[in-house]
């Protein structure tokens, strides 16, 4: 079973749309222990500096990137389960994305889809997928095949 308390999300920018915030809050209630750290929009270099100050060396860093690796929900659940409860930090860039040097620091880069999403929706999708991965590993009824 996934231990969500080992996961953290660092996200650039605020959620401005109420319906997205409501969706995020719904899934966060189902994922107690998941930490979400919001960073103020700034230049990419300032955002990178702030992110580097937050992450520690023992964290497994995953950046969300349109060129990252794509998974099915079951594959993502398996990959997370096989991480052996490492401290995993997911980083979602703002409107301008993340710097290439920050992406290069990542242990792996994740693509949620070949489509491009606003960062607010990417945050909702990632949190939903973490919830889905948790239910897949628990054998719960949420994920349908």
Swiss-Prot record:
Transmembrane stretches, start-end: none
Claim: Transferase is one of the keywords in the record: yes
Reaction catalyzed: pseudouridine(1915) in 23S rRNA + S-adenosyl-L-methionine = N(3)-methylpseudouridine(1915) in 23S rRNA + S-adenosyl-L-homocysteine + H(+)
Matching InterPro entries: Alpha/beta_knot_MTases, RlmH-like, tRNA_m1G_MTases_N
Subcellular location field: Cytoplasm
Quaternary structure and interacting proteins, as annotated: Homodimer.
Protein name, entry field: Ribosomal RNA large subunit methyltransferase H
Originating species: Prochlorococcus marinus (strain NATL1A)
Taxonomic lineage from the root: Bacteria, Bacillati, Cyanobacteriota, Cyanophyceae, Synechococcales
Annotated gene: rlmH
């Amino acid at each position: 079973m996934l231990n969500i308390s080992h996961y953290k999300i660092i996200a650039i920018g605020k959620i401005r749309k109420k319906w997205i915030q409501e969706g995020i809050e719904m899934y966060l209630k189902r994922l107690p222990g998941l930490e979400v750290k919001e960073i103020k929009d700034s230049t990419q270099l300032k955002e990178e500096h702030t992110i580097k100050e937050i992450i520690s060396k023992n964290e497994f860093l995953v950046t969300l990137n349109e060129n990252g690796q794509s998974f099915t929900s079951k594959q993502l659940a398996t990959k997370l389960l096989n991480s052996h409860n490492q401290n995993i930090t997911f980083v979602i860039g703002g409107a301008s994305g993340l710097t290439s040097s920050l992406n290069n620091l990542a242990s792996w880069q994740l693509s949620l889809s070949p489509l491009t999403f606003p960062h607010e929706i990417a945050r909702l999708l990632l949190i939903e997928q973490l919830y889905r991965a948790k239910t897949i590993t628990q054998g719960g009824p949420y994920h349908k095949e």
